[in-house]
Regions:
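N-terminal [4Fe-4S]-dependent radical SAM core
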Residues: 1-23, 32-59, 77-78
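Hydrophobic packing within well-folded, soluble alpha/beta domains
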Residues: 27, 31-34, 104, 113
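Conserved AdoMet/S-adenosylmethionine-binding subsite of the radical SAM
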Residues: 71-83, 92-158
């Protein structure tokens, strides 16, 4: 999964929970007010696209690590963290998201998902399976449908 950064401890990304937070690289939207605009491009600036579902970026863009390193970080924090928050960019844009959620669940961690909800069919698929269903979703509604082109750079429905 293409992740641009990791926060090993957060008390603010999931209300009432202590988590690690990962930021997915890439977002199909281009919101004018995006606070993570460096994560919009699917290839980090000055770097190549991250093709492997096992490869992620570490603490800095382009600092490659494997997804198992994220899981090692979580395993080392059993009893300290309640879960993993997956943010972005846009997590629903990654085909590896279901596997990442399932891996965190298999280790006993809850999963929170920050998403714009841009891909409702992908979100429905996650919700239909216990192994990939996030325990919490922070849904960031960008704008009313008639304002999406000016706010998010996309038209309603795509």
């Amino acid at each position: 999964m293409p992740i641009a950064g990791i926060i090993p401890f957060s008390a603010t990304d999931w209300p009432g929970k202590l988590t690690a937070t990962v930021f997915v690289q890439g977002c199909p939207l281009a919101c004018v007010y995006c606070h993570n605009s460096a994560l919009q491009a699917f290839a980090p600036q000055g770097g190549a696209a991250i093709a492997s579902t096992q490869e992620i970026a570490g603490d800095g863009i382009g600092d490659r690590k494997l997804f198992r390193d994220v899981m090692d970080l979580l395993r080392g924090r059993h009893g300290l963290l309640d879960g993993l928050v997956i943010s972005g960019g846009e997590p629903l844009s990654s085909p590896a998201l279901p596997a990442a959620i399932a891996a965190a669940h298999a280790e006993g961690f809850q999963v929170g998902l920050h998403t714009s909800g841009y891909a409702p069919a992908r979100l429905r698929k996650l919700l239909a399976d216990d192994s990939t269903r996030p325990e919490w979703i922070g849904l960031d509604v960008k704008a009313l449908p008639e304002h999406l082109p000016e706010v998010a750079g996309v038209s309603p429905g795509g």
